[in-house]
From Swiss-Prot:
Belongs to the small GTPase superfamily. Rab family. The gene is RAB8A. This is Ras-related protein Rab-8A. It catalyses: GTP + H2O = GDP + phosphate + H(+). It comes from the Eukaryota. The keyword Nucleotide-binding applies. The small GTPases Rab are key regulators of intracellular membrane trafficking, from the formation of transport vesicles to their fusion with membranes. Rabs cycle between an inactive GDP-bound form and an active GTP-bound form that is able to recruit to membranes different sets of downstream effectors directly responsible for vesicle formation, movement, tethering and fusion. RAB8A is involved in polarized vesicular trafficking and neurotransmitter release. Keywords: Autophagy, Cell membrane, Cell projection, Cilium, Cilium biogenesis/degradation, Cytoplasm, Cytoplasmic vesicle, Cytoskeleton, Endosome, Golgi apparatus, GTP-binding, Hydrolase, Lipoprotein, Lysosome, Magnesium, Membrane, Metal-binding, Methylation, Nucleotide-binding, Phosphoprotein, Prenylation, Protein transport, Proto-oncogene, Transport. InterPro entries: P-loop_NTPase (IPR027417), Small_GTP-bd (IPR005225), Small_GTPase (IPR001806), Small_GTPase_Rab (IPR050305). Regulated by guanine nucleotide exchange factors (GEFs) such as RAB3IP/Rabin8 and RPGR which promote the exchange of bound GDP for free GTP, GTPase activating proteins (GAPs) which increase the GTP hydrolysis activity, and GDP dissociation inhibitors (GDIs) which inhibit the dissociation of the nucleotide from the GTPase. Activated in response to insulin. It comes from Bos taurus (Bovine). The modification Phosphothreonine is found at T72. A motif (Switch 2) lies at residues 63-80. Its EC number is 3.6.5.2.
Length: 207
């Protein structure tokens, strides 16, 4: 059977339990929100195919358990990931502080050139905010990682986040292909300006 996509990207969602990883994934894959999800046991995944620069990209997105007892299972999935989203809850200071630990996990278990992004989730609950947007931006800047605030419930920036991560992965792949093509060959992939890595900070506004 003919392949229905041009690229397959494996993405991973990591972060403390209860930060809304499953809700973010469900919003992106099903365009729906369910506030009654129980904590993910081990690992689960969803698939969605998107189009970027005229190419069909199949995203295989793995949702990991945040609890310590599942850590051995979930770290095994880091290795093949091409993109990792680190999620914290803006109403939970501890989940933000633990992002540094999650980054250490990535450094230990994931590929050195994996694309990363930090998501401050639940930005619709501004009255209970414990972590300012500026602190999220600074942490991301410290590690050279892109940052967005999201809300799975209000559907803020979820689509933007996945598309941005996928675009960065594709740009990196295209550059590698271009670098591997013989000198003078026309077989290399041409990088268009909008594919180049850009720093994107999206303000969380509930309309």
């Amino acid at each position: 059977m003919a392949k229905t996509y041009d690229y397959l990207f494996k993405l991973l969602l990591i972060g403390d339990s209860g930060v809304g990883k499953t809700c973010v994934l469900f919003r992106f894959s099903e365009d729906a929100f369910n506030s009654t999800f129980i904590s993910t046991i081990g690992i689960d995944f969803k698939i969605r195919t998107i189009e970027l620069d005229g190419k069909r990209i199949k995203l295989q997105i793995w949702d990991t358990a945040g609890q310590e007892r599942f850590r051995t299972i979930t770290t095994a999935y880091y290795r093949g990931a091409m993109g990792i989203m680190l999620v914290y809850d803006i109403t939970n200071e501890k989940s933000f502080d633990n992002i540094r630990n999650w980054i250490r996990n990535i450094e230990e278990h994931a590929s050195a050139d994996v694309e990363k992004m930090i998501l401050g989730n639940k930005c619709d609950v501004n009255d209970k905010r414990q972590v300012s947007k500026e602190r999220g931006e600074k942490l991301a800047l410290d590690y050279g990682i892109k940052f967005m605030e999201t809300s799975a419930k209000a559907n803020i920036n979820v689509e933007n986040a996945f598309y941005t991560l996928a675009r960065d992965i594709k740009a990196k792949m295209d550059k590698k292909l271009e670098g591997n093509s013989p000198q003078g060959s026309n077989q290399g992939v041409k990088i268009t300006p909008d594919q180049q890595k850009r720093s994107s900070f999206f303000r969380c506004v509930l309309l």
